[in-house]
């Protein structure tokens, strides 16, 4: 009995030990699986929620940005259609846009010219004031009368005929937008007797534009370039005119003629010619650089005769900006014409700017008043100091023409 009970006790003890080991292993495996399951549910789920929220926010931002881009594109399309519509609505719209672009270009040129003036010094003499530069009023034209130290009598003849004196000239600037000045530089000895004589004349009449330029017959090309650069910096005008002091001019007729070309951005107006290139030394108008114009006997390109010509604002701006690289030929009218070669410039050949002193009278009687009159044989009015009044009497437009003119 005791042996059987003892044997059963051992079996039960062994069985309990076996069962407890099984359960222990099972429970360990179970807890391990439960731990994995618990971890999967507790941690990845919030992370996926964060990613999901970020994705949603990102998608929302992309959607809004896309809508903004679409609206911008639609706005641009509408704006483009509006602009094109405006262009097609008016036949003058393209010309107006071209003039606006030209105005912006000249404003840029103004800024460049001002900067160069500050960096390199003013192009005019130190004793000359520039009140117009501050106001920048708009003018129709600036008429520069080219003169020399020895031409006092010529200047007086011009003052007595077609250039209004003193207060009348100032009134002309204010009411008609026409500026008129005698243009002269300084002598090779600044402050000498010649300069003092001009200064005294300026104090009396106040009608000079003094240039930072040394006077000399062979320096006319440089003087012309300096004149346009200086006038462009001082006065905001539609046109800049150069005329010699031995030429008769009808100012009202000139203004009316130039006003016809106001919508032309780049226009060069004068009596166009093409004379022979003179290679022989010692003759008048000898061309030292004749070889640049081809074989002997060739002619110059078309250019305005030097007695009187006019250029538009854009061309004056071009000269001002490029003054340091523009080549100077010995003849100033040839130089000016060469500066416009290669540019999109309209050349206007107007024969009313170069009437003869014998023709201008009957033309005036017929109602076809000349803009300018002179004698071709003298490249100006022969003995102009003595004959200017007579030419003015016969060929002038009348004393009231300028007052009644509207441009």
Curated annotation (Swiss-Prot):
Q: What stretch or stretches form a coiled coil here?
A: none
Instruction: Tell me the enzyme class.
Output: transferase
- EC no. given is 2.4.1.-
What membrane topology term does the record carry?
Single-pass type II membrane protein
- Keywords annotated in UniProt: Glycosyltransferase, Golgi apparatus, Manganese, Membrane, Signal-anchor, Transferase, Transmembrane, Transmembrane helix
Where is this protein chiefly located?
Golgi
Positions of disulphide bridges = none
Q: In which pathway does it act?
A: Protein modification; protein glycosylation
Entry's Gene Ontology cellular component terms = Golgi membrane
Q: Where in the cell is it found?
A: Golgi apparatus membrane
Pfam families recorded: DUF4094, Galactosyl_T
Tell me where the transmembrane regions lie: 23-39
Which GO MF term does the entry hold, naming one? hexosyltransferase activity
In the record, biological process GO terms are: protein glycosylation
Q: Which cofactor does it need?
A: Mn(2+)
List, alphabetically, the InterPro entries matched.
Answer: DUF4094 (IPR025298), Glyco_trans_31 (IPR002659)
The UniProt entry's sequence similarity note says: Belongs to the glycosyltransferase 31 family.
Q: What does this protein do?
A: Beta-1,3-galactosyltransferase that transfers galactose from UDP-galactose to substrates with a terminal glycosyl residue.
Question: What protein name applies here?
Answer: Probable beta-1,3-galactosyltransferase 4
* The encoding gene: B3GALT4
